[in-house]
Swiss-Prot record:
This is Probable biotin transporter BioY. InterPro entries: BioY. It is a multi-pass membrane protein. Probable biotin transporter. The keyword Translocase does not apply. It is found in: Cell membrane. Keywords: Cell membrane, Membrane, Transmembrane, Transmembrane helix, Transport. The gene is bioY. Belongs to the BioY family. The keyword Protein biosynthesis does not apply. Pfam families: BioY. The chain crosses the membrane at residues 10-30, 38-58, 76-96, 104-124. Gene3D superfamilies: 1.10.1760.20.
C-alpha cells in the first residue's frame, strides 16, 4: 500500500527506509526481530521484494489513471505480491537453507516452506487493499498520467 498511497518514488523510498532501519537494529520485522542478520536470513528476500512491489504499484498509480480502479489494481497487487515479493523471497530462502542446512531444497519443498501457507491470507489482504485503492487515490488526473485522455467518466459524483 505504500506505493499506492505515496507514489512510485516515495513509496519505494519508504520501504527502503523501513528495511534500512530494521537492518540497523530496530526490531520491527517478523517476530520483533531486527539487525543485518534478518536481511541475510530466511526472510531477507521478502523484505527486498517489498521495495520492488512499492515501486511497481506506485508507478502504475502515478502514471495510469485506470490502474486506480479495483480490477486493475487487484491484478497489479497480485503480480507484485506473488512475483516481486515471493520470487526474491523464495530465492533467498533457498540460499539460506543451503547455507544453514547444507542442502538446497527442491522447488516443491521451497513452495511449501515459503509460499503455500500464506496464499489464503495474501489473497484476502490483496483484495482488501485493492478495494481501498479506489477510495484513497485521486479521482481527478493530476497531469502525470500517460492515459489522461481516459479520465473522462472516471470521477464518481
Amino acid at each position: 500500500m505504500s506505493g499506492v498511497i505515496l507514489g512510485r518514488y516515495w513509496g519505494g523510498l519508504s520501504q527502503l527506509i523501513y528495511v534500512i532501519i530494521g537492518a540497523a537494529g530496530v526490531p520491527w520485522f517478523a517476530d520483533m526481530s531486527g539487525g543485518p542478520e534478518v536481511l541475510l536470513g530466511a526472510t531477507g528476500g521478502y523484505l527486498l521484494g517489498f521495495i520492488l512491489a512499492a515501486l511497481l504499484l506506485g508507478h502504475f498509480v502515478d502514471r495510469h489513471i485506470r490502474a486506480r480502479k479495483f480490477t486493475p489494481m487487484l491484478g497489479l497487487m497480485t503480480i507484485a505480491n506473488f512475483g516481486l515479493i515471493y520470487i526474491p523471497g523464495l530465492v533467498v530462502l533457498g540460499l539460506w537453507s543451503l547455507k544453514t542446512q547444507g542442502t538446497l531444497p527442491g522447488p516443491w519443498e521451497l513452495l511449501v516452506m515459503g509460499l503455500l501457507p500464506f496464499i489464503p491470507g495474501d489473497i484476502l489482504k490483496i483484495t482488501g487493499a485493492a478495494a481501498l485503492t479506489r477510495a484513497i487515490t485521486p479521482k481527478e488526473p493530476y497531469g502525470e498520467e500517460i492515459d489522461i485522455q481516459k479520465a473522462e467518466g472516471w470521477r464518481v459524483p
